[in-house]
From Swiss-Prot:
Highest taxon above the source species: Bacteria
Classification via HAMAP family: Galactokinase
Record-stated family: Belongs to the GHMP kinase family. GalK subfamily.
Sites where the protein binds ATP: G124, A125, G126, L127, S128, S129, S130
Name the UniProt record assigns to this protein: Galactokinase
Species whose genome carries this gene: Escherichia coli (strain SMS-3-5 / SECEC)
Function: Catalyzes the transfer of the gamma-phosphate of ATP to D-galactose to form alpha-D-galactose-1-phosphate (Gal-1-P).
NCBIfam families in the record: gal_kin, PRK05101.1
GO terms for biological process, alphabetical: galactose metabolic process
Record-annotated site: Transition state stabilizer: R28
Record: residues binding substrate: E34, H35, T36, D37, Y223
Pathway: Carbohydrate metabolism; galactose metabolism
UniProt-listed InterPro entries: Galactokinase (IPR000705), Galactokinase_bac (IPR022963), Galactokinase_CS (IPR019741), GalKase_N (IPR019539), GHMP_kinase_C_dom (IPR013750), GHMP_kinase_C_sf (IPR036554), GHMP_kinase_N_dom (IPR006204), GHMP_knse_ATP-bd_CS (IPR006203)
GO molecular function, one term: galactokinase activity
Highest classification ranks of the organism: Bacteria, Pseudomonadati, Pseudomonadota, Gammaproteobacteria, Enterobacterales
Length: 382
């Protein structure tokens, strides 16, 4: 049963009438451009064919009822006329409440709604299950009440909800690609202007995501430390963000910086340049160059930004040994575990899967999870 059928059926059973709309918003994987988003830089993600799906209908009062199919059909209910505060026990409900609360601040021309939510974006894997939920909820209200909001505004609203209501710092990339993704394309995003450029993906190339299943523990504290180090670097150059520093400017005075901060800055500057070049390589179908850029990105994350772990490095090495210069592979996401992403000619996917199955668990004691994805369309009706 599809997520659409599942949520529609649950909706009718729970609320006693049929849903009028079903909305989806996808998860994402970032092909290249890591930790560049909060430095006002460039990222190159694509939406994937794993999504959050919401069957919904408008109400003729000011009540919001939300059922979470993936959390034992837990039900949350709140009013649009009372201050929206955090739910005491359902963390999932706070993403919904946060989106609705921040949407009221942007455009309050909407009424009540009934929703049933389900999704298949793997949680805790760094594939943006939370952003896809935020964008899905925003899109539900936009569609049901014909709100004059575009995808970028729905994305910004989701980011605000996550930062301010849920209390988790994040850049804009995850929500933006979920809202604006394009089938068979990646999206080059300028995280300062929020300008986007669709970049066509080469035919016959699979987007493979492999979850190391290494439990991330440091991700919150270390993420914040990296942000602070980047801000320290920007202040040293008297610039609002590292986006505004050139590699030549950095090289001239790198020796004056704290050595750790210098390494962090070097990663951001070189990663930004790699990301812009990667968009061109993909457009030209130059998988060899794309693979080189992904390898450089991984080395930079490992050695300069220091956000990889041995399990992730092992996975990358296993995949690289199979694909050689016919594709690319690197860690993706915040770091300290999580996933790797690989662009692999479709005919090599079985060999990669076999090599990983034979070697990764033997070397690390952990069993991986393997996803073959398609670059997919952003949020909308399904």
């Amino acid at each position: 049963m599809s997520l659409k059928e599942k949520t529609q059926s649950l909706f009718a059973n729970a609320f006693g009438y049929p849903a009028t709309h079903t909305i989806q918003a996808p998860g994402r994987v970032n092909l290249i451009g890591e930790h560049t988003d909060y430095n006002d830089g460039f990222v190159l993600p694509c939406a994937i064919d794993y999504q959050t799906v919401i069957s919904c209908a408008p109400r003729d009062d000011r009540k919001v009822r939300v059922m979470a199919a993936d959390y034992e059909n837990q039900l949350d209910e709140f009013s649009l006329d009372a201050p929206i505060v955090a739910h005491e026990s359902y963390q999932w409900a706070n993403y919904v409440r946060g989106v609705v609360k921040h949407l009221q601040l942007r455009n309050n021309n909407f009424g009540g709604v009934d929703m049933v939510i389900s999704g298949n974006v793997p949680q805790g894997a760094g594939l943006s299950s939370s952003a896809s939920l935020e964008v899905a909820v925003g899109t539900v209200l936009q569609q049901l009440y014909h709100l004059p909001l575009d995808g970028a505004q729905i994305a910004l609203n989701g980011q605000e909800a996550e930062n301010q209501f849920v209390g988790c710092n994040c850049g804009i990339m995850d929500q933006l690609i979920s809202a604006l993704g394009k089938k068979d394309h990646a999206l080059l995003i300028d995280c300062r202007s929020l300008g986007t450029k669709a970049v066509s993906m080469p035919k016959g190339v699979a987007v493979v995501i492999i979850n190391s299943n290494f439990k991330r523990t440091l991700v919150g504290s270390e993420y914040n430390t990296r942000r602070e180090q980047c801000e320290t670097g920007a202040r040293f150059f008297q610039q609002p963000a590292l986006r505004d520093v050139t590699i030549e400017e950095f090289n001239a005075v790198a020796h004056e910086l704290d050595p750790i901060v210098a390494k962090r800055v070097r990663h951001i500057l070189t990663e930004n340049a790699r990301t812009v070049e990667a968009a061109s390589a993909l457009e030209q179908g130059d998988l060899k160059r794309m693979g080189e850029l992904m390898a450089e990105s991984h080395a930079s994350m490992r050695d300069d930004f220091e956000i990889t772990v041995p399990q992730i490095d092992t996975l990358v090495e296993i995949v690289k040994a199979v694909i050689g210069d016919k594709g690319g592979v690197r860690m993706t996401g915040g770091g300290f575990g999580g996933c790797i992403v690989a662009l692999i000619p479709e005919e090599l996917v079985p060999a990669v899967q076999q090599a990983v199955a034979e070697q990764y668990e033997a070397k690390t004691g952990i069993k991986e999870t393997f996803y073959v994805c398609k670059p997919s369309q952003g949020a909308g009706q399904c």
